[in-house]
Amino acid sequence: MSGAVATLAPSRAPLRHSGADKPLLRFITCGSVDDGKSTLIGRLLYDADLAADDMLATLESDSRKHGTQGEELDFALLVDGLAAEREQGITIDVAYRYFATDKRKFIVADTPGHEQYTRNMAVGASTADVAILLVDARKGILPQTRRHSVITSMFGVRHVVVAVNKMDLVDYSEEVFRKIEQDFRDFAKHLRFTSIYVAPMVAKDGDNLVHGSTKMPWHKGPPLLTYLEGVAVEDTTRIAPFRYPVQWVNRPNLDFRGFSGFISGGNIRPGDIVRILPAGRDTRVARVVTYDGDLESGVSGQSVTLTLAEEIDVSRGDMLCSPVSPAKVGDRLEAQVLWLVREPLVVDKTYLLKIGAKITAATISTVNARIEIETGLAAPLEPGATLQFNEIGEASLSLETMIACDPFIDNRETGGFILIDRITNETAAVGMVKTVASSLGRSAPTLTDLSYASMEGVAAPAAANAPATISLGKTLAFAAAGGVATFGVVAAFGQNASLAAQIALAETGALAVLHYVFEKFWRAPQTPAAPTDETPPFTGEGL
């Protein structure tokens, strides 16, 4: 065994350090318990000469202590790093591994299959481009397989590999493989996968992982690693509208005030106009600052500090975005929710909602539907319904404050949130924004919107009561004119300004009352215009 380890060393070193200018692919392994997820990753790294010498030496030692493969190496131990994982032979936490081939860089997340660790699987899915869904050829599609499929689709993973593992235990049967393939395709037709690749394999033997299978000649597709190197995944955040959630107000001294964060979409240059949400004010970017100096531009995926041309109030949790395609602003959300704790969701209970760096109180007002794991479809629920542990539903949320966000389908970074129990501080749920609305009746109110609304609020009542308003104005003007005239006469002839003021005030009050009575009761009201059957001209109001 040690000799085999030594021969792998020369070819591994350049591979591990040769990924500087290559495209990056993030993928996860998921599926039901004991389907071989960790074994698949460990064997893939081993066969591709991507496991370092010290890792292999540790693997030999751990295989003797905790291995489940007899005298053979237990490749799952290359990935399962926690003591509890090694002792129990299961995956508990998400394990990340980084490697590169001649064609691509990879970050793989090995996620647990046990039901109680679904929250950890969701963490891995939240950033993945591709999901490798392990299926035991003997058992077929299980409930946890379906649940993980729904979760990966929910988190925006668009490419899935169905790895039908342990084919040696069904005598490499094509019939068994085809049935599992058809079962999954029938189930997944309602999910939002762009591509589904189904491949047979034996992970512990490395069959169809790096090299094509010699025992299943009926399978014509590429081995797993070849597929991963070639799958086309678009980075839509680079062409998306600019999004910049502010994580920190950077004020190291009196001469510098910047706003630090992660560019979640688009790009930014000095001189670009940005909109600050939820306030809705526009300003101009002065500098794009990093530790290594100023940049000519910042792009999606970079952490930078932006300075603005004006001294404007911007706080942690605010968002700087494109004024042409701004994020939505609102305090009402429709969202998909994955419930993560044993205690059921409580309707009308207040939780903390965290989206980016923004934290606000949120109440789940209704649970509108539950995703049925057997079908992947949403089933409507009665009012007052709730969600149990690991259930997925569609819910309506009311927020305490306005937030800026996007539908999750448009931007993962600005459309995903978590709900935190205010008593236990547990992460109770993870959610994906579907739609955003405002209790003010608009989907994205800004300062400009609110100023117009306030003007309309004053102008509309005044217009509706125009005759009364005009009458009152005439009354006050008439009375004031009389009072001023009386003051002038008395002051000039009586030489007593104090007495003149008292007489003028008394006269002003009396004249106001008399004139108002005249306008209100003696003057004939205007005859309203006769109704007409003509349709008023279209103005576009209300669109």
Predicted regions and their residues:
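Juxtamembrane/disordered regions of integral membrane proteins
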Residues: 441-543
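Conserved nucleotide-binding/hydrolysis micro-motifs of P-loop NTPases
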Residues: 35, 46-47, 114-115, 138-142, ...
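C-terminal effector/interaction modules appended to NTPase cores
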Residues: 2-27, 35-38, 101-102, 253-469, ...
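Canonical P-loop GTPase G-domain recognition
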Residues: 170-236
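P-loop NTPase switch module centered on the Walker A-proximal segment
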Residues: 10-116, 128
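Accessory interdomain/linker segments of ATP-dependent helicases and helicase-like nucleic-acid enzymes
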Residues: 204, 221-257, 275, 282, ...
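Conserved Switch II/interswitch segment of TRAFAC-class P-loop GTPases
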Residues: 104-106, 111-117, 125-149, 153-178
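Active-site phosphate-binding and catalytic loops of NTP-dependent enzymes
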Residues: 66-69, 80-92, 187-196, 229-242, ...
